[in-house]
Amino acid sequence: MNQRLQRLADQIQRELAVLIRDAVNDPRLTGFVTISSVKVSPDLGYADVYVTIMEPELNDAMTMSNHEESIKVLNKAAGFLRTELSHSLKTRTTPRLRFHYDEVTARGNYMMDLISKAVIKTEENESDEQENEE
């Protein structure tokens, strides 16, 4: 991606984060929406927006159906968001927005949880071995 497209993608990411937080008031959109990246097509026709969604309660695990529902809500609001985005962008055309759930971030969080559990288990085993030696 060239520098101009990257700057535009960064601006879209910043503006959309504010718009989703402040302007989208759909009750089906539960959780905290984070825009992890934006990729703009070379002809500025489309912008693929990758989002992660975290539940407001730490103990609540979002199921895949919750993610799909949230993505549907965002895609339904894409026209409104595009219109609002056009007021702040200094381009002739505003890209059409396509929202996708960011699997990479979710898998990374899952792997970090697995690593943390493994480290805790290793530390417990080492402390048990030290107690047995004494």
From Swiss-Prot:
SUPFAM superfamilies, per database record: Ribosome-binding factor A, RbfA
Q: Which InterPro entries match?
A: KH_dom-like_a/b, RbfA, RbfA_dom_sf
Q: Which GO terms describe its biological process?
A: maturation of SSU-rRNA
* Protein origin, superkingdom: Bacteria
Q: Does the keyword Cytoplasm apply?
A: yes
The record's section on Gene3D superfamilies has: 3.30.300.20
What GO molecular function annotation could you give as one example from this UniProt entry?
Answer: ribosomal small subunit binding
Q: What is one term from the GO cellular component aspect held by the record?
A: cytosol
Q: Which UniProt keywords apply?
A: Cytoplasm, Ribosome biogenesis
Where is the protein found, in the record's own terms?
Cytoplasm
Instruction: Name the job this protein performs.
Output: One of several proteins that assist in the late maturation steps of the functional core of the 30S ribosomal subunit. Associates with free 30S ribosomal subunits (but not with 30S subunits that are part of 70S ribosomes or polysomes). Required for efficient processing of 16S rRNA. May interact with the 5'-terminal helix region of 16S rRNA.
Annotated family: Belongs to the RbfA family.
What do we know about how this protein assembles, alone or with others? Monomer. Binds 30S ribosomal subunits, but not 50S ribosomal subunits or 70S ribosomes.
Instruction: Cite the NCBIfam families for this sequence.
Output: PRK13816.1 (NF010389), rbfA (TIGR00082)
This chain belongs to which protein, by name? Ribosome-binding factor A
